Amino acid sequence: MSIALDSSTATAAAAPSPTRARIAALLALPLPELIFQAQTVHRQHFDPTQVQISTLLSIKTGGCPEDCGYCPQSAEFDVGVKASKLMDIAPVLEAARRAKEAGAQRFCMGAAWRSPKDHDLDRVAAMVEGVKALGMETCVTLGMLRPDQAARLKSAGLDYYNHNLDTSPEFYGSIITTRTYQDRLDTLAAVRDAGINICCGGIIGMGEDLDDRAGLLATLADLDPPPESVPINALVAVKGTKLGESAPIDPIDFVRTIAAARISMPRSWVRLSAGREALSDEAQALCFLAGANSIFYGDTLLTTANPAVARDNALFDRLGMTKLS
């Protein structure tokens, strides 16, 4: 299959796509009405008291040649992130064992590459096989993939491949110049053709407007089928990156984005991802009420802070929520 960027979303067209217009209308609703609609949809497809738990490990950190304006792992920015080589298999599997013992259902592995070299992909495939043998779901994010590379990961048993769109087609060029939006869609098509589930979302708070948020969610929702997993990130502004001086996003705006994602992609897992450390327990509770049902679990998320496991467990207890087993 191929995924082409619709010309109606590739430029700032006067008439937005029906999906985009519908999502823009959702984002403009009074918050109580929006959350009510999102929770109603959520209950039709999921147990609203359960949260899917994923853990993310950086298996190759820093030195990425891409110029993503938000990313401390880009070689374009001097932020003190030391580039590392791809990890050996044994410590990755040990980290996966610890994650499973802590309650994680899915183990995600991220490498800061533009795209993987084939010899590195062989080692990643062995990691996938080892994590699968532990009884966990697997996800990797390695950059752009060729169709044969996606097929190699599928043969290793990979469950999910993460490749985010980041933002709307219109706003994308102000954040990233070293790969195109279509490059990202091509990787998603290769992953889908290989029979791997897609994990794909974006980042809120990079200076985009509400229409850009609607454009991101519409592009995701219009994928056929939509991603099985949709991570929604709040920008973590790292000093020294292009977006390092960005103001924090209003938590209510973040909740609105979660709710619109849930309504527009009713069967997808909607994950609270980067930036959750800055959200209060009350803001996270609103996100769960708005349809979020997945988190990254663990004290770090690649190179940024994440809520402590003890804090998450205490929050789940207070809310009467349980981890999906």
UniProtKB/Swiss-Prot annotation:
- EC number of the protein: 2.8.1.6
The Swiss-Prot or TrEMBL record lists the needed cofactor(s) as: [4Fe-4S] cluster; [2Fe-2S] cluster
- Which SMART domains does the annotation name? BATS, Elp3
Q: How is the cofactor bound?
A: Binds 1 [4Fe-4S] cluster. The cluster is coordinated with 3 cysteines and an exchangeable S-adenosyl-L-methionine. Binds 1 [2Fe-2S] cluster. The cluster is coordinated with 3 cysteines and 1 arginine.
Any idea which GO molecular function terms this record carries? 2 iron, 2 sulfur cluster binding; 4 iron, 4 sulfur cluster binding; biotin synthase activity; iron ion binding
| Entry superkingdom | Bacteria
What InterPro entries would the database entry show? Answer: Aldolase_TIM, BATS_dom, Biotin_synth/BioAB, Biotin_synthase, Elp3/MiaA/NifB-like_rSAM, rSAM
Q: State where [4Fe-4S] cluster binds.
A: 64, 68, 71
Give residues annotated as binding [2Fe-2S] cluster: 108, 139, 199, 271
Q: By its UniProt entry, which Pfam families does this protein fall under?
A: BATS, Radical_SAM
| One of the GO BP terms on file | biotin biosynthetic process
Q: What does the record give as the reaction this protein catalyses? A: (4R,5S)-dethiobiotin + (sulfur carrier)-SH + 2 reduced [2Fe-2S]-[ferredoxin] + 2 S-adenosyl-L-methionine = (sulfur carrier)-H + biotin + 2 5'-deoxyadenosine + 2 L-methionine + 2 oxidized [2Fe-2S]-[ferredoxin]
Keywords from UniProt, A to Z, are: 2Fe-2S, 4Fe-4S, Biotin biosynthesis, Iron, Iron-sulfur, Metal-binding, S-adenosyl-L-methionine, Transferase
**Ranges where the Radical SAM core domain occurs:** 49-267
Pathway(s): Cofactor biosynthesis; biotin biosynthesis; biotin from 7,8-diaminononanoate: step 2/2
Q: Partners and quaternary state?
A: Homodimer.
Q: Which HAMAP family match?
A: BioB
In UniProt terms, what function does this protein have? Catalyzes the conversion of dethiobiotin (DTB) to biotin by the insertion of a sulfur atom into dethiobiotin via a radical-based mechanism.
The UniProt similarity line reads: Belongs to the radical SAM superfamily. Biotin synthase family.
What's the protein here called?
A: Biotin synthase
Q: What species is given as this protein's source?
A: Acidiphilium cryptum (strain JF-5)
Name the gene: bioB
